[in-house]
């Protein structure tokens, strides 16, 4: 497995209970991200307090990237967080996702220049569980953002 300095970008908006579970799972990775950036689309003070609490519990830098709440602008705040990221490899998740302990390791293991990795969630229901594996897309050679 080739090692990359990995930045984990977590987008959130006013749901600190879910973000806490996401942060807990982020800090329990078998391959830790080099940094965590919380892309906050205008949450209230509870989110900032939660992030401050988690900063005190880990040596992994946690960066809170916040923008004023002027409506749904998650794309804008993700872009701002990515601009602040220092990793060569960026993993982006929503703040209501609980990461499998090998989530970062699995991403890094299939990462290559010019490759975009996507996947879906494990959906847990009262009578069923579904899972989709990560997929690597090789066609992102001339991506323009």
Mark where each language-model region is.
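N-proximal low-complexity "stem/linker" segments adjacent to membrane-targeting elements
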Residues: 1-25
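Short aromatic/hydrophobic "clamp" motif used to bind/position activated sugar donors
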Residues: 90
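The conserved acidic donor/metal-binding loop of glycosyltransferases
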Residues: 94-98
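Single conserved hydrophobic/aromatic residue that forms the stacking wall/gate
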Residues: 133, 140-145
């Amino acid at each position: 497995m080739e090692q990359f300095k990995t930045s984990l970008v977590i987008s959130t908006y006013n749901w600190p209970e879910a973000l806490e579970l996401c942060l807990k799972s982020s800090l329990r990775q078998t391959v830790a991200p080099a940094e965590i950036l919380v892309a906050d689309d205008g949450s209230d003070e509870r989110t900032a307090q939660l992030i401050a609490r988690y900063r005190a519990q880990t040596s992994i830098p946690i960066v809170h990237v916040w923008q004023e709440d002027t409506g749904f602008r998650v794309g804008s705040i993700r872009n701002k967080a990515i601009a602040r990221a220092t990793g060569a490899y960026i993993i982006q998740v929503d703040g209501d996702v609980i990461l499998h302990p090998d989530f970062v390791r699995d991403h890094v293991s299939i990462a290559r220049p010019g490759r975009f990795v996507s996947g879906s969630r494990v959906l847990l229901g009262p009578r069923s569980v579904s899972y989709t594996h990560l997929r690597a897309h090789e066609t992102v050679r001339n991506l323009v953002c």
